[in-house]
Amino acid sequence: MVEWTDSERAIITSIFSNLDYEEIGRKSLCRCLIVYPWTQRYFGAFGNLYNAETIMANPLIAAHGTKILHGLDRALKNMDDIKNTYAELSLLHSDKLHVDPDNFRLLADCLTVVIAAKMGSAFTVETQVAWQKFLSVVVSALGRQYH
């Protein structure tokens, strides 16, 4: 079990309280699909992903980005049991969707870039430490069924 300090909890809660899920979710998923184009293979049913412009304009990608952020909200609300919170989602991604678990880390990295850009100087080293810890726990939980 991961132990969280009061400061870490406060930082992560603060980040989420200021997030526009639609904007941040869309930008993060789009960035992942553009920067790491091999991740597009999991989104074949989402239509044309031919170039950056079509990805950025794709409403299905935008909606899925928002869904991802709401999924992270579940981790925020269950910080003391993220592993079990994501057990079913991990199973779905491993057994049914066959998503390479490294892609969770790539998306987490893109999410960090987008949030850091949005927060600017408020994204301090202390903030990044807490945020990276949170995302590392989430990524580990999502990859749990692969081990």
Swiss-Prot record:
Question: Which Pfam families does the entry link to?
Answer: Globin
Q: Name one GO cellular component term.
A: blood microparticle
The entry lists its GO molecular-function terms as:
haptoglobin binding; heme binding; metal ion binding; organic acid binding; oxygen binding; oxygen carrier activity; peroxidase activity
InterPro entries, per database record: Globin, Globin-like_sf, Globin/Proto, Hemoglobin_b, Hemoglobin_oxygen_transport
Has UniProt tagged this entry with the keyword Transmembrane? Answer: no
Question: What processes in GO biological process is this protein linked to?
Answer: hydrogen peroxide catabolic process
| Keywords from the named record | Heme, Iron, Metal-binding, Oxygen transport, Transport
**Distribution of this protein across tissues and organs:** Red blood cells.
Where would I find the Globin domain in this sequence?
3-147
Q: Does the keyword Transit peptide apply?
A: no
Q: Matching PROSITE patterns, A to Z? A: GLOBIN
> Where is heme b bound in this sequence?
H64, H93
What protein family does this chain belong to? Belongs to the globin family.
Its subunit composition reads: Hb 3 is a heterotetramer of two alpha-2 and two beta-2 chains.
Q: What else is known?
A: Hb 3 displays a Bohr effect, which is enhanced by organophosphates, and a Root effect, which is enhanced by ATP.
- Function description: Involved in oxygen transport from gills to the various peripheral tissues.
What protein does this entry describe?
Hemoglobin subunit beta-2
Record gene name: hbb2
